[in-house]
């Protein structure tokens, strides 16, 4: 089809659908003996979009993945953390099964099971939540608990979390109510003492109190443009009882709280049992024994813990696990950089000793998997900067010395006589 203002005879043209002339519209598109204006095209698009929205609920009734299928999908993207993946797969399956059956089964009301992820930084908490949302094709948003404050104080309202979720699905309330919200750094809103405070803690216990109803399930009134700045606009009513909340945090020091409980034997005085250092459990083993009382001592209020009945603990990643993360997942870091280099027509090779060196460096930094990208980026920075301006480079090889900063990557050229290193 072509865009026309006048036909060959010089006659004024009109839209065949609405009858407007070419001077009343921006564009007039010509077909065989008919014309359609841009306004009618927009109207057709709106009609189609409305029909898609009506069909969408039927598509959502497609088969829900089983816990085994969810776990298998997580295995494709997340290395290790087997117990956490099992717990998450079952919790997510039960949550969406509950939604599909209208919150009831044979007259029994099914409760909501939000999830608490406990594990060191870089252990995969955020990645697990993102991967679940991608598998289930539901809206997903992340929030940082450290930026939240009680209503009326400077900072983000907890309702802003729901507003972000609505943004992810173009303010489609029905879609948002099937979404997943991941609240990171949840350990940072612990109260400063496990005793109730006489002073107001607006970013600690106050935020926990504000999150209670949101996480448990309430009808949140959310303005489409967010915040408290537009009091006159119409509010959207979002039922948060259908939204799955996953809270995650490193909980540094929680292992010591658990150790004080589990490693002190029975008895007092001369009858007390004192465990030797060799008998003491590792941090991962201790975290797997977490109880609600430990979280209360850490600084979470009992009511908040009660809203997060499913607890999954993640272990600190070993050097071997970091090497696997570098090369095995579908979106492994080495595969991502190889794809980037392929766009330049260049192959990228990571030798095994280079992967070992990257993992060792990340372990030394204590940043877990999150630190891997910065190490690889630093090693490849100069090469990626120069490569678009270079010719005849066929391959780039990364070895241990490159990661250690002792040499530049090996560049292999198409012409054997031009082979050079570190140019």
Swiss-Prot record:
ClpX-type ZB domain mapped to chain residues: 2-56
Superkingdom of source: Bacteria
Positions that bind ATP: 120-127
Record-linked Gene3D superfamilies: 1.10.8.60, ClpX chaperone, C4-type zinc finger domain, P-loop containing nucleotide triphosphate hydrolases
SMART domains: AAA (SM00382), ClpB_D2-small (SM01086), zf-C4_ClpX (SM00994)
Assigned GO CC terms: HslUV protease complex
Zinc-finger as UniProt keyword: no
Keyword Chaperone: yes
Keywords: ATP-binding, Chaperone, Metal-binding, Nucleotide-binding, Zinc
Similarity comment text for this entry: Belongs to the ClpX chaperone family.
Oligomer status and interactors: Component of the ClpX-ClpP complex. Forms a hexameric ring that, in the presence of ATP, binds to fourteen ClpP subunits assembled into a disk-like structure with a central cavity, resembling the structure of eukaryotic proteasomes.
NCBIfam families noted in UniProt: clpX, PRK05342.1
Function per UniProt: ATP-dependent specificity component of the Clp protease. It directs the protease to specific substrates. Can perform chaperone functions in the absence of ClpP.
Protein name: ATP-dependent Clp protease ATP-binding subunit ClpX
């Amino acid at each position: 089809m072509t865009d026309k203002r006048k036909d060959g005879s010089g006659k004024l043209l009109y839209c065949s659908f609405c009858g407007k002339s070419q001077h009343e519209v921006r564009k007039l598109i010509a077909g065989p003996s008919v014309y359609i204006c841009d306004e009618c095209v927009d109207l057709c698009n709106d009609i189609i979009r409305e029909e898609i929205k009506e069909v969408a609920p039927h598509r959502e009734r497609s088969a829900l993945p089983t816990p085994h299928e969810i776990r298998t999908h997580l295995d494709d993207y997340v290395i290790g953390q087997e117990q956490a993946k099992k717990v998450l797969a079952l919790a997510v399956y039960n949550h969406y099964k509950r939604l599909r059956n209208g919150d009831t089964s044979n007259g029994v009301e099914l409760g909501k099971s939000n999830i608490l992820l406990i594990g060191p930084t870089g252990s995969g908490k955020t990645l697990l939540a993102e991967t679940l949302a991608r598998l289930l094709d539901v809206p997903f948003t992340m929030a940082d608990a450290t930026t939240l404050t009680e209503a009326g104080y400077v900072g983000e309202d907890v309702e802003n979390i729901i507003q972000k979720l609505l943004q992810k699905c173009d303010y489609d309330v029905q879609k948002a109510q099937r979404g997943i919200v991941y609240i990171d750094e949840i350990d940072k809103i612990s109260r400063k003492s496990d005793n109730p405070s006489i002073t107001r803690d607006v970013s600690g216990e106050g935020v926990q109190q504000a999150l209670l109803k949101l996480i448990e399930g309430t009808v949140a009134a959310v303005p489409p443009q967010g915040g408290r700045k537009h009091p006159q606009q119409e509010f959207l009513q979002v039922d948060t009882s259908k939204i799955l909340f996953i809270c995650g945090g490193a909980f540094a020091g929680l292992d010591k709280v658990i150790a004080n409980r589990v490693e002190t034997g029975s008895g007092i005085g001369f009858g007390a049992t004192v465990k030797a250092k060799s008998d003491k459990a590792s941090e991962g083993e201790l975290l797997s024994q977490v109880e609600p009382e430990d979280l209360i001592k850490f600084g979470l209020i009992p009511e908040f813990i009660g809203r997060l009945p499913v607890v999954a603990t993640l272990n600190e990643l070993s050097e071997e696990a970091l090497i696997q993360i570098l090369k095995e997942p579908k979106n492994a870091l080495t595969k991502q950089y190889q794809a980037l280099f392929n766009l330049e027509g260049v192959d990228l090779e990571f030798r095994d000793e280079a992967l070992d060196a990257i993992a060792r460096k990340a372990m030394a930094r204590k940043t877990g998997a999150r630190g891997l990208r910065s190490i690889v980026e630093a090693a490849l920075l100069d090469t990626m900067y120069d490569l678009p301006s270079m010719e005849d480079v066929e391959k780039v090889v990364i070895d241990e010395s490159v990661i250690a900063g002792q040499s530049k990557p090996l560049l292999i050229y198409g012409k054997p006589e031009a082979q050079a290193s570190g140019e």
